[in-house]
């Protein structure tokens, strides 16, 4: 699937819920299925700066696509990074760099987060794009 198709799928899923309490529960459930980063990669280098919670993100290239794994010490944040990994993992670096993140606004996520969590979301996206930039430069 393309990034755009995945984003559209996520928007459709979020539109099924009537209120934000249900959406928060769904985000938390998504976090339970997060591809967890190996303990050896839970380093300061892989910590996303600007997040209220501890968030680790690691990316590696396989078959010309970036595979992301992550973890967080907060259940809601774990769900947020799970949404981003679902969107951007198994994609080519150039596709990640070209992708927009308007779907975040479409599902209303940023406006329903505290200011510090919203800043953390921006930091997570920025870190994913940095991985894509680095891997794209290597190719």
Task: Go through each PLM region and give its residues.
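A short interface-forming secondary-structure element
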Residues: 72-74
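Glycine-rich phosphate/pyrophosphate-binding loops
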Residues: 90-107
């Amino acid at each position: 699937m393309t990034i755009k198709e995945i984003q559209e799928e996520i928007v459709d899923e979020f539109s099924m819920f009537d209120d934000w309490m249900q959406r928060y529960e769904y985000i938390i459930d998504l976090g339970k299925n997060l591809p967890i980063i190996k303990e050896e990669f839970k380093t300061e280098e892989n910590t996303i700066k600007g997040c209220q919670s501890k968030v680790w993100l690691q990316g590696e290239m396989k078959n010309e696509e970036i595979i992301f794994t992550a973890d967080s010490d907060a259940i809601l944040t774990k769900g947020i990074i799970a949404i981003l990994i679902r969107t951007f993992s198994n994609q080519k670096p150039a596709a990640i760099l070209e992708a927009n993140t308007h779907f975040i606004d479409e599902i209303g996520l940023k406006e329903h987060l505290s200011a510090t969590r919203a800043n953390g979301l921006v930091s997570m996206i920025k870190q994913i794009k940095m991985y894509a930039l680095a891997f794209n430069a290597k190719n």
